[in-house]
């Protein structure tokens, strides 16, 4: 008997993620970043539990203490690398080239493999701590192969000024997916890199228009070409959203798990709307908050004797009226951290959650009866967790 395709429900709510992100963000700031490992764990558990293929939620069972210990381990290693290796590079740089620029260049190149190393290890940890229907996901060891492939594909992407991007995206995703397991079943990434050309076309064309406009303006000094910039820039941002939706859709539609396969109907227009509406809402909220704070402090300054006469000929304040001198400093600190916290909170509410919801609700599992024979896999202890990703830092991505 054939089963119907499994659809995915999404049970997340903006109000709940706002409260969670705000509470954990404040605690992270108060603890000077120490709470971030607990914040990440709680946020991830919320998102995972909201995604429910076939009505059954994903589970995230990672622990914050794992992340903390992994971070400390990574910091010790990176401190050695940055301290000792860079010292050696600086010595040879001054000895051979009479300057420090070569040392900085080699140092950046030297740390690049660690970034790819951290990305693969972080993905392995997240999958090892994710379960669905009680069965664990997993990623088999293969970090060395991923690092050299990432270096090769990213190098070709830079050499081709971004034209190679779809090829890079496909082959790196294929490497990761082909080593991903659900229980004892291996996933497979089908298709080819050619299927990603179409989602990339808006970016190709908008960048070509922007670059061509710049060349025309420089060569002719004719301002009549300038309006093309106002076409190219919005088109570029549309292309970014279209690439996110299109690449997810094409890659998902060619993923299989044994006889089961994934299907996605993610829509470009919906992702564009989420980003446009989300950034507009965030900008409007911050502008309104800035106006409100300005009015409030105008009232406070007026009540405490501040006047235009307190500003000298160079534009500096000579007195704050009856306000203590530490008040502006305290206000600046509070404002900085308030912006830091609320930017992250609003981004979760208006961008991250709606995008996750759309991708989840447009994803289905075809031929789900093939999943019935899948058995549990052994637990991957993986003591270092996401330490290198947090330390570099690459740990903000889900």
What are these regions (language model features)?
Residues 2-17, 21-185, 200:
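Transmembrane-helix bundle segments that line or gate the permeation/cavity pathway
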Residues 29, 108-113, 158, 162, ...:
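Residue-level hotspots within the lipid-embedded alpha helices of multi-pass solute transporters
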Residues 38-46, 117-131, 164-178, 219, ...:
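Juxtamembrane/interface segments at transmembrane-helix termini
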Residues 47-61, 127-144, 174-196, 248-272, ...:
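Juxtamembrane inter-helical linkers in multi-pass membrane proteins
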Residues 77-91, 158-172, 204-220, 279-302, ...:
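Alpha-helical transmembrane segments and their membrane-interface junctions
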Residues 82-111, 210-237, 289-344:
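Membrane-helix interface segments in multi-pass membrane proteins
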Residues 98, 139-141, 145-154, 158-270, ...:
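Long, contiguous internal "core" modules enriched in hydrophobic/ aromatic residues
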Residues 250-286, 297, 306, 317-326, ...:
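Cytosolic/matrix-facing juxtamembrane and C-terminal tails of multi-pass cellular membrane proteins
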């Amino acid at each position: 008997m054939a089963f119907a395709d499994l659809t995915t429900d999404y049970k997340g709510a903006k109000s709940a993620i706002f409260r969670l992100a705000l509470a954990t963000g404040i605690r992270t700031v108060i603890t000077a970043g120490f709470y971030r490992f607990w914040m990440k764990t709680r946020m991830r558990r919320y998102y995972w539990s909201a995604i429910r293929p076939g009505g059954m939620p994903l589970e995230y069972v990672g622990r914050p203490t794992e992340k903390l210990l992994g971070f400390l381990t990574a910091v010790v290693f990176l401190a050695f690398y940055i301290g000792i290796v860079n010292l050696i590079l600086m010595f040879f740089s001054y000895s051979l080239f009479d300057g420090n620029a070569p040392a900085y260049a080699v140092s950046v190149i030297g740390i690049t493999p660690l970034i790819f190393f951290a990305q693969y290890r972080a993905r392995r940890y997240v999958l090892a701590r994710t379960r669905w229907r009680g069965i664990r996901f997993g990623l088999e060891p293969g970090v060395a192969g991923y690092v050299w492939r990432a270096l090769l594909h990213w190098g070709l992407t830079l050499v081709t000024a971004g034209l190679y991007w779809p090829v890079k995206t496909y082959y790196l995703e294929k490497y990761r997916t082909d080593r991903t397991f659900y229980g004892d079943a291996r996933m497979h990434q089908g298709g080819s890199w050619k299927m990603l050309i179409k989602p990339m076309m808006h970016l190709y064309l908008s960048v070509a228009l922007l670059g061509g406009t710049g060349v025309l303006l420089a060569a002719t000094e004719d301002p009549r070409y300038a309006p093309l910039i106002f076409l190219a820039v919005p088109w570029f941002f549309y292309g970014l959203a279209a690439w996110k939706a299109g690449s997810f859709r094409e890659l998902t539609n060619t993923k299989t798990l044994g006889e089961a396969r994934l299907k996605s109907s993610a829509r470009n227009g919906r992702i564009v709307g989420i980003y446009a509406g989300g950034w507009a809402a965030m900008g409007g909220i911050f502008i309104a908050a800035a106006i409100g704070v300005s009015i409030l402090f105008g009232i406070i300054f007026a009540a405490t004797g501040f006047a235009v006469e307190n500003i000298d000929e160079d534009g500096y304040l000579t007195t704050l009226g009856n306000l203590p001198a530490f008040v502006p400093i305290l206000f600046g600190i509070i404002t900085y951290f308030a912006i830091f916290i609320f930017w992250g909170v609003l981004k979760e509410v208006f961008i991250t959650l709606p995008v996750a919801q759309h991708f989840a609700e447009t994803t289905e599992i075809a031929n789900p009866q093939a999943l019935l024979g899948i058995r549990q896999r052994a637990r991957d202890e993986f003591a270092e967790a996401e330490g290198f990703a947090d330390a570099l830092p690459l740990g903000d991505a889900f």
